[in-house]
Design a protein with these regions (language model features):
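Active-site segments that bind and position negatively charged phosphate/pyrophosphate groups
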Residues: 196-225
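Acidic-aromatic/histidine active-site loop/patch
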Residues: 98
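ATP/NTP phosphate-donor binding region
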Residues: 1-91, 200
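A glycine/threonine-rich phosphate-anchoring loop and its flanking beta-alpha core
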Residues: 15, 106-198
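Predominant activation on well-ordered alpha-helical scaffold segments within soluble catalytic domains
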Residues: 75-78, 176, 180, 190-191, ...
């Protein structure tokens, strides 16, 4: 399944496909330096799948949790890119949930005033919501998302297969946003939760949730109201 976020020159494709993680290199140029940002909650096999497609992949695996959205970790990513000679033609790839996406996206927005950002969400909530829209940020002085930027990815690849490794509680909790979206704007999506096993229909759930998020972003990219 494929969607296109239509934002003029900042438009990009959103791919929802089982096995999509192994095809990222077919969808966007990875024949360059790629900072692959992940955390300890992401299976190592996913990281290896991405790195195998990169000509010069530079992995950074951070601690799992909200504390990673810090000035310290942000600086760490920028320093690694500088030490490896990243230029504006290179890329940052987020492999993880919303925390990884927020942090990696802000690093991509900031390094040399912006490098290519690729988002490969691996949690339920990030696949159905936070991976698109361009909001990137870190926390500062105990306040969430104080410092950040609107910076759209060049590609989003949501591979539902990556959700199979999540604890069941985390998988179910992440679906709350999809249930809310169904109640508000998509009766068919809501009915999926009443009649189907969410695991069996997860690709459709992700797709239909992102359709609604995409429509909101296209109308009001920067939440101007």
């Amino acid at each position: 399944m494929k969607l296109t976020m239509r934002l003029g020159v900042r438009s990009y494709d959103i791919i929802i496909k089982q096995g999509g993680l192994s095809r990222v290199g077919q969808l966007i140029n990875l024949n360059r330096r790629v900072l692959v940002v992940s955390d300890t909650g992401v299976p190592e096999a996913y990281l290896k799948t991405v790195l195998a497609q990169c000509r010069e992949g530079v992995p950074v695996v951070l601690p799992q949790g909200e504390g990673t959205k810090s000035l310290e970790c942000f600086g760490q990513l920028l320093t690694v890119m500088l030490e490896h000679g990243f230029t504006r033609g290179d890329a940052v790839l987020a492999l993880g949930g919303g925390v990884v996406g927020d942090l990696a996206g802000f690093a991509a927005a900031s390094y040399m005033r912006g490098v290519t950002f690729i988002n490969c969400p691996t949690t339920t909530l990030s696949q159905i919501d936070s991976s698109i829209g361009g909001k990137t940020a870190i926390n500062l002085a105990g306040t969430k998302n104080t410092v950040g930027a609107f910076y759209q990815p060049s590609l989003v690849v949501a591979d539902p297969d990556t959700l199979k490794s999540l604890p069941e509680r985390h998988f179910i909790n992440g679906l709350a946003e999809a249930v809310k979206a169904g109640l508000i704007a998509d009766e068919g999506l809501f009915e999926l939760f009443e009649t189907e096993d969410a695991h069996e229909k997860i690709e459709e759930i992700v797709y239909r949730s992102l359709v609604m998020k995409k429509n909101v972003v296209e109308r009001d990219e920067r939440e101007a109201g």
